[in-house]
Amino acid sequence: MGNITTENSSLSCPIDHTIHQTLAPVVYVTVLVVGFPANCLSLYFGYLQIKARNELGVYLCNLTIADLFYICSLPFWLQYVLQHDDWSHGDLSCQVCGILLYENIYISVGFLCCISIDRYLAVAHPFRFHQFRTLKAAVGVSVLIWAKELLTSIYFLNHKEVIEDEDQHRVCFEHYPIQAWQRSINYYRFLVGFLFPICLLLASYQGILRAVRRSHGTQKSRKDQIQRLVLSTVVIFLACFLPYHVLLLVRSLWERNCEFAKSIFNVYHFSLLLTSFNCVADPVLYCFVSETTHRDLARLRGACLAVLTCSRTSRAREAYPLGAPEASGKSGAQGEEPELLTKLHSAFQTPSSLGVGGPSTVGLA
């Protein structure tokens, strides 16, 4: 890349984007292909939790919606890196896509923190704090999280994010070295958006493990399963978010010149790409490991098999010679529709409650 002109001055800071332009398309395509269908299913399972009056579903749905917003911005970022970091859309679209890219991190962290606290209260204090474990309380907390991040987004809308370099490339959300106005918002992001929530999350999961170890009614295999789930959740959370925030803090503290910006560019953008995998990890950890979700998937699979079976039967009957006898005495869709509806109905018959009670797998995630 060439020299980048910032809001305040022209800075000669040519940075080689080759590694970033090679890795980013691979990551973005992977997250698009895997993350979009996974999060669509996750949204459906979260809806089932809400339908069962389980407050966990509110947090899961909001977490999934945030991930889907981010995934919807990936085609624009994919086009951007494939055009050698040249933003071909308007300034406002750059700001919106940048906000979706960065604010998704803190919206996700916020809801992951809420899920961990909710599961801690369910496991360690199942007969207390009911006022905090209701749909109304979950909706109120969700509104606060979205409002906090929307207010933060306004801060970026007041600054120019599309900058033209000496090669007439319009770079988006890239300032090298980091600007003064970015330092304060980065400190806020690190302390309030990451450090405080991760402390709450770690404390909650530690409390869950303590409560599970003290439980005499839980089998050892079940305890081991819970411990593995908690450990994997924490490890994936730290792997996705810790490197980026450490480097964000390093940039904010010490990036004063172009040489430092060039030296940290590749590792910083690699850490930013790691945050993208959170969109894939969320539905896996918080939905697809759930026992209730396994049952829902089995019902969904059964419904799909019912559709395919009826479709194959219909095609086979259509292949009969003219005048051939038919077992049902009916033909076409009229003979198949009742059978299909019956199979779909039986496949989706659910227990009276899909909620998660006590230390179940999804309850701990």
Curated annotation (Swiss-Prot):
Per UniProt, subcellular location reads as: Cell membrane
- In Swiss-Prot or TrEMBL terms, this protein is called G-protein coupled receptor 68
A Pfam family for this UniProt protein? Answer: 7tm_1
Disulphide-bridged cysteine pairs: C13-C258, C94-C172
Where is the stretch described as Extracellular loop 2 (ECL2)?
161-176
Family designation? Belongs to the G-protein coupled receptor 1 family.
Q: Which residues lie on this side of the membrane: Cytoplasmic?
A: 50-53, 126-133, 215-218, 290-365
PROSITE patterns cross-referenced by the UniProt entry: G_PROTEIN_RECEP_F1_1, G_PROTEIN_RECEP_F1_2
What stretches pass through the bilayer? 13-49, 54-84, 90-125, 134-160, 177-214, 219-254, 261-289
The Swiss-Prot or TrEMBL note on domains reads:
A multitude of proton-sensing residues, which include extracellular histidine residues (His-17, His-20, His-84, His-169 and His-269) or triad of buried acidic residues (Asp-67, Glu-149 and Asp-282), contribute to activation of the G-protein coupled receptor activity and pH sensitivity.
| Site entry: Proton sensing | H17, H20, H84, H169, H269
Q: Which UniProt keywords apply?
A: Cell membrane, Disulfide bond, G-protein coupled receptor, Glycoprotein, Membrane, Receptor, Transducer, Transmembrane, Transmembrane helix, Tumor suppressor
Where does the UniProt entry place glycosylation sites? N3, N8
GO biological processes: cellular response to pH; insulin secretion; monocyte differentiation; negative regulation of monocyte differentiation; osteoclast development; positive regulation of insulin secretion; positive regulation of insulin secretion involved in cellular response to glucose stimulus; positive regulation of osteoclast development
